[in-house]
């Protein structure tokens, strides 16, 4: 029969792992989101600054009227959902800047006139794709650090 030494101590460490891991992962997710948001703000075309100022991240769902880049959900807990977004009631045109518009005929006050369309000025998904790999790396590092911290008794 095999006897495991210090089983109670190991059990205590394993029980502490989820809380320590959650804090480390949350910190890593915040750092990754801040990097992505900073890149988005540097790439967005600026007229009056409303669109640039509307870019951000939040825990949970994006504010109403905004365009969400991605919602990153942790497999550990449902409360670790981080959403990166752009646009709000004032900067409602975020998706038009990101994807552009096609040529169309105006209606309303300027009915019958032609709008030439606008070219896409991507800032949103470009930033997400450029930082996706490093963000995952940061989160994995957070998990490793949490396991290491629990193992050393920290």
Regions found by a protein language model. Give the residues of each.
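Short, Lys/Arg-rich flexible segments
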Residues: 1-94, 99-154
